[in-house]
């Protein structure tokens, strides 16, 4: 979660959201989650690009035309976000449930929580990548020790 907070601060967000968790997982030096994401063609840059495209499409749905224009980059916040958004609370809840307790929580559990989100920025962005998210979810579940995720 420390890396997710860093991601949120880099984008100037007042809260840590699901996209920050996903970007943090993609940048995680821990091999399991990185290999799982790579197996689906989802490296950190591809995820970032999908999030940017989702943002442009959301603006378009609100009537803001950005075709042919480059969006300004995010401004880093001087203050670290101290709050978690609802999407992160869901990720943590699902991750802890998959791990059976907080002490066993690993990045793969959080990735499973991210992949189980049904609505919001991250599911829309991941859909834009064309990655087989059902297969990725199955691979994540298989990677968990003793198949702890049974709920």
Label for each model-derived stretch:
Residues 1-151:
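Histone-fold recognition with a strong bias for associated Lys/Arg-rich disordered tails
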């Amino acid at each position: 979660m420390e890396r997710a907070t860093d991601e949120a601060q880099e984008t100037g967000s007042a809260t840590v959201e699901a996209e920050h968790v996903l970007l943090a997982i993609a940048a995680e030096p821990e091999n399991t989650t990185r290999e799982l994401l790579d197996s689906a063609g989802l490296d950190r840059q591809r995820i970032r690009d999908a999030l940017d495209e989702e943002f442009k499409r959301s603006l378009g749905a609100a009537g803001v035309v950005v075709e042919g224009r480059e969006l300004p980059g995010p401004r880093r916040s001087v203050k670290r976000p101290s709050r978690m958004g609802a999407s992160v609370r869901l990720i943590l809840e699902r991750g802890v449930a998959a791990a059976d307790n907080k002490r066993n929580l690993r990045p793969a559990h959080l990735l499973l929580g991210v992949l189980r989100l049904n609505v919001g920025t991250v599911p829309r962005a991941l859909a834009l990548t064309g990655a087989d998210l059902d297969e990725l979810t199955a691979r994540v579940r298989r990677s968990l020790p003793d198949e702890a995720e049974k709920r």
